[in-house]
């Protein structure tokens, strides 16, 4: 039994209720259940942690200190465990040197390919650079037919200015008769005078030969003479036909551009042998950006239009600016956009050699007067950035700088010698700029000589296989040069999935966390067949997933529940998809079988007449699109992966509105303008990033309800008698907190060779507060007891205090009744963090002018959670505000009022508007993939709703 199954006994990690689970081996197993029900606790914190721990335990103590040690999970036993590999969404590298090519190891094979069969070509003259022996040169010349006339020349001067008198004298002394100067034959005996200001080419005629039998020796002697004379170069003029250039060195015979011996490290931008010397292999340089220096050109100089010189701490730069304006007669009360170019030029780039009178008065009234050379705002920011040793100042100045493509390597990251090596007419930089689909076509259609093919056969197989795996997981639109840090969680996970398939391991336990995130329904089938392929290799796959198609394709489903948090942690159902559907206890089964479903709204909202329009959006792959966003409705932006959704919403709409409305520093993506901004007064991005980076942040502090709770404790009679104010009940400041653990409740003990151990503070026993503070009670509970309550318990406890009840009620509304008020932010999942943020917005008053942006809010959510989330989002829209989601989930798309569908494909073939309108209008559009997959869902759910209505009518009658 142990061999066919993984048997978990007594799992108690987090909220798991001492459960026993049997997971079949070598099968595709889906773990599902509500958000917070304990799926990740079972998959990652129990099974993966134990599999990884057992493997690491087998290594030496020395090796263990370099590996992330896993805590021993709280479980009685796990049998039948294999080495475990976790593919989650958190581990994308933020390193700018990490690209799709390096992460998938395709780049390593490309380097090897270029080093072995690449053809060096002079970038200036387009001549192939190769070193040849005299024997090879003779054979090449003798390949011409008999009686071909030719002359052998030694190129002494190639395109250099001067009279070259000495060169000509040397030729005469050595007894040569003819010379070719600038393409014209001359006798050496002539008086030759050259114009010293023009470039000249001088070639000595060594020999004139007619191709015939027995000429080899003479030909070889003449070639050797020419090579000796011209430093290893020779020109063979086939009279009336062509000229051949030969070189004994790895160098261009015309300009001498040379390339060292080709080796893989020469093509690595992470090695000093291959990296571009200007940008050190990053492909970009940080340059001062004029748009960030003057973010709002409608402001005047006296209104601090020049952002880096705002008078925050010192008046030095504002006074200098005033001196420059006085000197050049520049009006400081004219908006910057109306200033003449020559005046703005002086402010931005300096006075050159012209001196300016500068009088500076500091805060103490001391005056300094001087004649100065004014360097200009942009050179000033650049100089201070490079000269400062303060990280704080460097971070401040970086806000006015932007990444620009490196001028030397044009963003290709490699030095010019590496970029001079071509295969199929493309250098390595150009190949990595191709999308994965284009790269696959390029390598499959590559025409190679027999010799090159035999060398490259295995390398090309590896490259093509890996490109194929990436296409199978729906990533054909990515380029190999795409920085890993810019990938979404789902993309990064699918890349690692493709890399794992490339390794072709068997007998491994893979644990995946929602691989379908960010994937359009169209590409889902390819992902599922990839997972099935990994299973068929002989691996066990445990997939934490909510996607209906993946669940139906699984061999075995384990439904964790029945609720979330304290109400979860049990196995409610386990079996094949059919068995789950027929199990009345399984919430997932009810949704899979259609007994439960998310209803379609009976009617779509009409826009309120107001809208804003983005014009000429052209960032990344957007094709100069104009998009109108109606306000007062629920909008979904849809489209296949890589079609430009995130670019349009996150890079342009969010950043441009935040810059205009909240004076944010982030520079928006390329677009002409946004019309109608006056209809929006706030833009709020509710993403899945943590609500805090430390355990001190928790739902109570984030939603602001903790302030009100502390007020309640400060108002108790005992607190008043003791003179305790609200601050006494904060665990972040001295006074009321336990000083032994500084209000953390736990103490970290560092262990070498073992993971760090966290133990409860022995002074306060994890309560965070000192004894005096805990003497104060409200309705019999201390402040520590309140933090330990679940949201549901707190709602009941504070039911008589409206302002607290209102804030806690919003947490219940978004489905977070099970989390504790004081639960550390670091332990919340992405979906939970996002819902805490939503809750904190819900209790604020609606203005009717707020735009909420959510990027894939359904990540990590079960269908039942999505139902609850949609009710909250619809409530926000009912209040008059606008909700804009980027989404692939058809359950969400079917309930919105307005769809903007981008596409038609991903990458270069995307970036246009395919369809827009209500879901009913979009399904009628021929080229819309979203419409194609949405149509059957709308039809299915309409039928379900009709039958539901009929059932109700029958029950009534």
From Swiss-Prot:
A single GO cellular-component term on record: cytoplasm
Main location: cytoplasm
Recorded coiled-coil stretches: none
Zn-finger (C4-type) residues: 252-279, 738-764
Residue positions binding ATP: 33-40, 639-646
Biological process annotations from GO: nucleotide-excision repair; SOS response
Bilayer-crossing regions: none
Domain of life: Bacteria
CDD domains for the chain: ABC_UvrA_I (cd03270), ABC_UvrA_II (cd03271)
SMART domains for this protein: AAA
Domain ABC transporter: 309-587, 607-935
Localisation: Cytoplasm
Family of the protein in this entry: Belongs to the ABC transporter superfamily. UvrA family.
Chain's role: The UvrABC repair system catalyzes the recognition and processing of DNA lesions. UvrA is an ATPase and a DNA-binding protein. A damage recognition complex composed of 2 UvrA and 2 UvrB subunits scans DNA for abnormalities. When the presence of a lesion has been verified by UvrB, the UvrA molecules dissociate.
Record text on subunit structure and interactions: Forms a heterotetramer with UvrB during the search for lesions.
Protein name per the record: UvrABC system protein A
Species name: Halalkalibacterium halodurans (strain ATCC BAA-125 / DSM 18197 / FERM 7344 / JCM 9153 / C-125)
Gene: uvrA
């Amino acid at each position: 039994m142990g061999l066919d199954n993984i048997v978990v006994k007594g799992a108690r990690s987090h909220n798991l209720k001492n459960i026993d689970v049997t997971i079949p081996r070598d099968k595709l197993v889906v773990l599902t259940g509500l958000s917070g029900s304990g799926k990740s606790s079972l998959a990652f914190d129990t099974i993966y942690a134990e599999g990884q721990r057992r493997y690491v335990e087998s290594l030496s103590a020395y090796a263990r200190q370099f590996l992330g040690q896993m805590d021993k999970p709280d479980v009685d036993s796990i049998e039948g465990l294999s080495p475990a590999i976790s593919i989650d969404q958190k581990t994308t590298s933020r390193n700018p040197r990490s690209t799709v090519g390096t992460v998938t190891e395709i780049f390593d094979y490309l380097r090897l390919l270029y080093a072995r069969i690449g053809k060096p070509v002079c970038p200036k003259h387009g001549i192939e650079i190769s070193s040849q022996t005299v024997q090879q040169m003779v054979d090449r010349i003798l390949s011409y037919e008999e009686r071909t006339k030719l002359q052998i020349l030694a190129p002494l001067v190639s395109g250099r200015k001067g009279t070259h008198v000495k060169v000509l004298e040397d030729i005469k002394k050595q007894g040569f008769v003819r010379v070719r100067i600038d393409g014209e034959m001359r006798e050496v005996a002539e008086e030759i005078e050259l114009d010293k200001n023009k470039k000249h080419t001088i070639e000595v005629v060594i020999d004139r030969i007619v191709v015939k039998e027995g000429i080899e020796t003479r030909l070889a002697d003449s070639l050797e003479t020419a090579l000796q004379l011209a430093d290893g170069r020779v020109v063979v003029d086939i009279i009336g036909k062509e000229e051949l250039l030969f070189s004994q060195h790895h160098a261009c015979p015309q300009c001498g551009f040379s390339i060292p011996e080709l080796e893989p490290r020469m093509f690595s931008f992470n090695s000093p042998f291959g990296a571009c010397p200007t940008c050190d292999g990053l492909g970009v340089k940080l340059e001062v950006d004029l748009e960030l220096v003057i973010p709002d050109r409608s402001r005047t100089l006296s209104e601090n239009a020049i952002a880096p010189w705002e008078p925050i701490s010192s008046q030095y730069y504002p006074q200098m600016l005033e001196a420059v304006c006085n000197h050049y007669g520049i009006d400081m009360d004219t908006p910057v956009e109306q200033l003449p170019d020559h005046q703005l030029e002086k402010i931005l780039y300096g006075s050159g050699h012209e001196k300016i009178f500068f009088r500076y008065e500091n805060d103490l009234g001391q005056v300094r007067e001087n004649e100065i050379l004014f360097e200009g705002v942009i050179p000033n920011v650049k100089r201070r950035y490079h000269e400062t040793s303060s990280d704080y100042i460097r971070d401040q100045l970086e806000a006015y700088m932007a990444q620009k493509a490196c001028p030397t390597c044009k963003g290709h990251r490699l030095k010019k010698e590496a970029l001079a090596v071509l295969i199929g007419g493309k250098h390595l930089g150009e190949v990595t700029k191709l999308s994965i689909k284009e790269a696959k076509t390029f390598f499959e259609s590559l025409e190679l000589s027999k010799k090159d093919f035999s060398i490259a056969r295995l390398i090309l197989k590896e490259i093509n296989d890996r490109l194929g795996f990436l296409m199978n997981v729906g990533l054909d639109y990515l380029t190999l040069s795409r920085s890993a840090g810019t990938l979404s969680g789902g993309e990064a996970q699918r890349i690692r999935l493709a890399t794992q398939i490339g390794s072709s391991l068997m007998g491994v336990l893979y644990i995946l966390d929602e691989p379908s995130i960010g994937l359009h329904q169209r590409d889902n089938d390819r992902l599922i067949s990839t997972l099935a392929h990994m299973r068929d290799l002989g691996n066990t796959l445990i997939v934490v997933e909510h996607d209906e198609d993946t669940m139906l394709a699984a061999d075995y489903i384990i439904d964790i529940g029945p609720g979330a948090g304290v109400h979860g942690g049990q196995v409610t159902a386990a079996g094949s998809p059919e068995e789950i559907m027929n199990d009345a206890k399984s919430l997932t089964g009810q949704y899979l079988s259609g007994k439960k479903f998310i209803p379609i709204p009976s009617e779509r909202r009409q826009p309120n007449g107001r809208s804003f329009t983005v014009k000429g959006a052209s960032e990344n792959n957007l094709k100069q699109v104009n998009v109108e966003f109606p306000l007062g409705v629920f909008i979904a932006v849809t489209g296949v992966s890589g079609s430009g959704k995130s670019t349009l919403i996150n890079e342009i709409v969010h950043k441009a509105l935040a810059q205009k409305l909240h004076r944010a520093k982030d520079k928006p993506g390329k677009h002409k303008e946004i019309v109608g901004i006056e209809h929006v007064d706030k833009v709020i991005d509710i993403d899945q990033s943590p609500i805090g980076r430390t355990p001190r942040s928790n739902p109570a502090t984030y939603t602001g309800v903790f302030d009100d709770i502390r007020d309640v404790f400060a108002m108790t009679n005992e607190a008043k008698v003791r003179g305790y104010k609200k601050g006494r009940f904060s665990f972040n400041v001295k006074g009321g907190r336990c000083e032994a653990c500084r209000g953390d409740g736990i103490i970290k003990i560092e262990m070498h060779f073992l993971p760090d151990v966290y133990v409860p503070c022995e002074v306060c026993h994890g309560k965070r507060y000192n004894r005096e503070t805990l003497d104060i009670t409200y309705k019999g509970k201390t402040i520590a007891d309140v933090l330990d309550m679940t949201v549901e318990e707190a709602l009941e406890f504070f039911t008589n205090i409206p302002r607290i009840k209102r804030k806690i009620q919003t947490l219940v509304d978004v489905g977070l009744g099970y989390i504790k008020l004081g639960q550390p932010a670091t332990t919340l999942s992405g979906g939970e963090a996002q819902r805490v943020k939503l809750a904190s917005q819900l209790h604020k008053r609606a203005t009717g002018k707020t735009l909420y942006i959510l990027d894939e809010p359904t990540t990590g959510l079960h269908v039942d959670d999505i139902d609850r989330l949609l009710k909250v989002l619809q409530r926000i829209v009912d209040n008059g505000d606008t909700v804009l989601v980027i989404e692939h989930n058809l359950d969400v798309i079917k309930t919105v009022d307005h769809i903007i569908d981008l596409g038609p494909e991903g990458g270069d073939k995307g970036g246009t508007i395919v369809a827009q309108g209500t879901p009913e209008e979009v399904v009628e559009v021929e080229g819309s993939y979203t419409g194609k997959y949405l149509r059957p869902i709308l039809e299915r759910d309409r039928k379900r709703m009709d039958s539901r209505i009929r059932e109700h009518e029958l029950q009534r009658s």
